[in-house]
Each structure stands twice: as C-alpha cells, then as structure tokens.
Amino acid sequence: MSRLALNRYSRCFSRLKTLTTPLFFSSSAASNRDGDYQIGPPPIRVGLTESAGRAVFATRKIGAGDLIHTAKPVVACPSLLKLDSVCYLCLKKLMGSAKFEDRGVSYCSQECQENSKGFLDVETRADWSSFDDYCRTHNFKYPLMVKRLCCMIISGARPADCLDILQPAVLSSEMISKIEDGYGLLWNAFRKANFKDDDVAFLTKQWYTAILARIRINAFRIDLVGGSCGEDLLSLAAASVEGEGAVGHAVYMLPSFYNHDCDPNAHIIWLHNADARLNTLRDVEEGEELRICYIDASMGYEARQTILSQGFGFLCNCLRCQSTD
C-alpha cells in the first residue's frame, strides 16, 4: 500500500446502508495534528454502497493532516529477510543490543515477548524447515501469515473465523494448485508435532484456501517511516522504492474497509511498528467517503490499471482514472 498521493477532488456517493455486523478490530480515537486526543470514538462509520460494497465515511468534518484513527493488526508477520532485525511480534526495528530473545527469535520489549508467548509455544513445537523453505524458494509471504494465524488460533489468541468478514480474492486454478502444496506442508508440520485433532480441526484445505484468499487481497506491506538510530535516510528511501524496505505484512479489520482511489483523501502509515495510523490528506466533509491508495499513486494510468486489475481484481474508475491522468 502506497503512502504517495495527490489530492484534488471531492466526491459524492450513493445511498448507504449502515453495517450492523460487529467488527473485530482495535482502534483509538482520533487526534488532531498536535496529538491532542479527542473524547469519543473515531469520526467514521462503515456503510454499504451500491457500487463498491463496504466503505468508510466521515461522521463529521475532518481537517487536513488529522489522525482519523489507529489500528492494531489482527495478524502481522515479519519478512523472512527481516527475522534478525525486527521484533517478532510488532515488527519494530531492533536497536542493537536493546532486544529481548526467546527461543531463537527477538523482541523489542518484554511486553511483546509476553504477548507472543501463547503462539510461540505452539510454533516451537513443530519443525517448520520444509514450510519455510517452500515460502523462501517461491518468495511467498502470505502462507507465513497463515502459519502465524494458525498458531494464534491453536493458542486461543484468535478465533478461526476472525477474518471471515473480509472480502476474499478470486483465485486462479494455478494459484489454487500452489496453495495446495503449502497446505500439505503446513498440515504435516502440525501432524508430525502430535497436536491433538481438536486443536487443528479448523485447519481444512477449504479453510486454508479461504484464509489465503482473504489475506492476499487485504494484507498491507509494512514500510516503516521511522528507522533505527543511525540508519541513513537516503538508503531507507531507496530500499522502500525497491520494495526491500518492507519489514513484513499485516492484516487489519477496519483499514481493510477503506476503498481505493488513485487520488485519495486519506493514507495509512506506520511510524515505528505494525500499528497503523490513518490520516487525512486534505479536508474531508461530513458524509464523504474516506479512500486510500492501494498502490504507488505516482505511476501512470496504464500501469495503475494493470496492477489493480491483476493484484486486486478491479479496474479503477476514480475521477483521476476517468481523465486517464
């Protein structure tokens, strides 16, 4: 998900039907640019549109640059390339010797170490070498998130249906074939570790495929704005452009309801860890839909449409794309 954006247009939207489904997410109240927190819930609501499904709308006017809300991930997972340099739970970059180690992984704080104990107890019972090699060889990132979610479910930290409310991606037959390979490796790792049948009863091929389909279209790539002390800012920027700056990926509940626009009025950023911050890019009026850009908004029209079609399954019809800008 890109943080780059332009801001030009305001929009009018179709009639809404407010969602009554309870949402599984953690978010804070909004604050202004000076960081003063306001009393009450975030100034947004989730509704349904006739054309784009779920959407997020402002319940009052929100100023340019204001924090809309924050959100903690339902599941977050570090990149295999970053296992030695970021916190195993929150993905914060580790600062030299200031880290806490437990069974071969590192954390930024004792709090993260304690909060990870449940799923780490499950994870360390199994041998993941074949599964990790499979992900590393094919450069797969989302199966690693499923692995972590499975460990969280077995430990009781998450219910097996925690992502069911999210929209799934449409998977090709080729993708499904590759998914089956990953499922077999994941299932065998738990089976060989002698987990009870009741503990892994949820882990069917159907569940695995459905979870991957949801993670694939809803996962955010975590590019941290704040680096470790002493890191060269130019190097950080170059790594981000090349895609090497990502510390991992995460799935959120409320941020996943934001629709896309190539000229968004909001964006999502990560300052120091996987806790997401949604900010406005310009003034937003009461009742206006809040939209973010799923990709690099600096790309040309054809490139944007290709990536959105292949990666997210839709062609963008925002005002910017209508003008083929």
Swiss-Prot record:
Reaction(s) catalysed (UniProt annotation): L-lysyl-[histone] + S-adenosyl-L-methionine = N(6)-methyl-L-lysyl-[histone] + S-adenosyl-L-homocysteine + H(+)
Alphabetized UniProt keyword annotations: Chromatin regulator, Methyltransferase, Nucleus, S-adenosyl-L-methionine, Signal, Transferase
One Pfam family linked to the record: SET
A GO term from the CC aspect: nucleus
Database matches in CDD domains: SET_SMYD
Signal sequence residues: 1-30
InterPro entries per the UniProt record, alphabetical: H3K4_H4K5_MeTrfase, SET_dom, SET_dom_sf
Main enzyme class: transferase
Protein biosynthesis in keyword set: no
SUPFAM superfamilies per UniProt: SET domain
Top-level taxon: Eukaryota
Gene Ontology BP annotations: methylation
UniProt-listed Enzyme Commission number(s): 2.1.1.-
Subcellular localization(s) per the UniProt record: Nucleus
Main location: nucleus
One MF term in the entry's GO annotations: histone methyltransferase activity
Domain SET: residue ranges: 42-295
PANTHER family in UniProt: HISTONE-LYSINE N-METHYLTRANSFERASE ATXR4, HISTONE-LYSINE N-METHYLTRANSFERASE SMYD
Its job: Histone methyltransferase.
Stated family: Belongs to the class V-like SAM-binding methyltransferase superfamily. Histone-lysine methyltransferase family. TRX/MLL subfamily.
Protein name: Histone-lysine N-methyltransferase ATXR4
Lineage: Eukaryota, Viridiplantae, Streptophyta, Embryophyta, Tracheophyta
